[in-house]
Amino acid sequence: GGEAGKGVFATAHEGAAQYCRKVDKREIPVCPILGVNIAVINMNWLLKYLAQNIHQLQGDYICVSNVHTTVVSYEDADYRAVQNGGLMAIPDGNPLAQEARRRGYPQIQRTTGPDLMMEVFRQSTAHGWRHYFYGSTQEVQEKMIARLQQEYPGLVIAGTDVPPFRELTPEEDALAVARINQAQPDFVWVGLGAPKQERWMAAHQGRVHGLMIGVGAGFDFFSGNVRRAPLWMQKHSLEWLYRLMQDPKRLFQRYWSTNLKFIWNATIRRK
């Protein structure tokens, strides 16, 4: 971070100003929770929407939103603008879907990043969709690609890139964008972790020619590095507990503080 690191992200709002959306975002119903417009959708609706509009969505981005990103947005106006500045913010976290239902949106269903990846990969050969993977580590990406090619025969992987963990220089960034655009992907899956991946997508809105989707742990799930919770835990909103047991050191502090803030501000104060 620091001053020197602001290069790539400083242009977020300039980039967005130049980006001209080809679809009407108002057609996507939303429920504002802690200032973030959470899309009132379910998986079937989203898949149909993507299939119908994918060529009009080049250069836009989708945020995969959960309690953590929503609480961070509530406390950080810049990040809130990033969450609200894309095509939509989908309810990856069950608490968001439950809160929206309590607020009078019964049709909303949890739509997780890994599930979305899986469904899009399933439909890709029929549509001829091309995929680009940006982020994570070389090891994770190699494992993930091997597994995807095995599980989804015919899946077109147009390209992959593992950026360094430091901020890129403007020159490096321009090269990264050129590589993505040369590959002509329909979907650009971004695995930099929140909030970094959402800021990256906003900074590249209109510059990257593909639909960017920030999937964080999605790369880890597909590489097999992180196992997903059993289905019964997913159904009972206990996936967070399963992940906590796998990575207690990193996640305990985050879950404890953000979950409490969410319950207090969203559930009790109805922000």
Q: What is the meaning of each model-derived region?
A:
Residues 12, 16-115:
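N-terminal nucleotide/polyanion-binding subdomain common to many enzyme families
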Residues 59, 129, 208-210:
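A short helix->loop->beta-strand "cap" motif at the edges of active sites that frequently abuts
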Residues 77-85, 198-217:
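A short, gly/pro- and small-residue-rich
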Residues 96-98, 196, 218-223:
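Short gly/pro/ser/thr-enriched loop/turn and capping motifs at secondary-structure boundaries
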Residues 97-100, 228-271:
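A transmembrane-helix-recognition feature enriched in membrane-embedded lipid enzymes
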Residues 97-183:
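Conserved beta-alpha
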Residues 180-189, 193-194:
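Proline-aspartate-enriched helix->loop->beta-strand connector
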